[in-house]
């Protein structure tokens, strides 16, 4: 799945200036090209978007309480439980009682799910490595500096 770089109808001209639209297109091109590997590999997992979001949350945060997953997803506890039932049946997550509070249920990725994530990330890492090898040391430094600036700006904008 690739971002349609020629379809600028998705860009709101009242929000983004011409220069900002160009940055957006480049930003999306980088995300789709090098992000987490080939998006088609993720599509092969044949999961709903909410299921994928749960897996991403667990991959990023480790073990989470069911209530925390529901809160982060903006979903009801019953919907979250249904999602977790399907993911557990598919062998992607495992539930257990919290060691701190036995009444609380926690969820984590199974080793199989972790292996899948490692494989998907590895493909993205290899693609990025091959791409960076094509750059001169000066170009790599420029990419690093530009991404550092953008990362700081995105973090600061998130605080507002």
UniProtKB/Swiss-Prot annotation:
Keywords: DNA-binding, Transcription, Transcription regulation. InterPro entries: ArsR-like_HTH, HTH_MarR-typ, MarR/SlyA-like, WH-like_DNA-bd_sf, WH_DNA-bd_sf. The keyword 4Fe-4S does not apply. Residues 20-152 form the HTH marR-type domain. PROSITE patterns: HTH_MARR_2 (PS50995). Coiled coil: none annotated. PANTHER family: MARR FAMILY REGULATORY PROTEIN, TRANSCRIPTIONAL REGULATOR, MARR FAMILY. This is Uncharacterized HTH-type transcriptional regulator YfiV. It comes from Bacillus subtilis (strain 168). The gene is yfiV.
């Amino acid at each position: 799945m690739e971002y349609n770089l020629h379809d600028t109808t998705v860009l709101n001209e009242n929000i983004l200036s011409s220069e900002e639209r160009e940055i957006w297109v480049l930003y999306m091109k980088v995300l789709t090209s090098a992000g987490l590997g080939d998006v088609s590999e993720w599509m092969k997992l044949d999961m709903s978007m909410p299921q994928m979001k749960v897996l991403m949350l667990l991959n990023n945060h480790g073990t989470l309480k069911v209530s925390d997953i529901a809160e982060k997803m903006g979903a009801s506890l019953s919907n979250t439980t249904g999602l977790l039932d399907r993911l557990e049946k598919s062998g992607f997550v495992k539930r257990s009682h919290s060691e701190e509070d036995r009444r609380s249920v926690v969820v984590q990725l199974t080793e199989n799910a972790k292996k899948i994530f490692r494989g998907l990330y590895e493909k993205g890492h290899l693609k990025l490595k091959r791409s960076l090898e094509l750059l001169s040391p000066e170009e790599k430094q420029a990419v690093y500096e530009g991404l550092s600036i953008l990362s700081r700006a995105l973090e600061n904008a998130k605080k507002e």
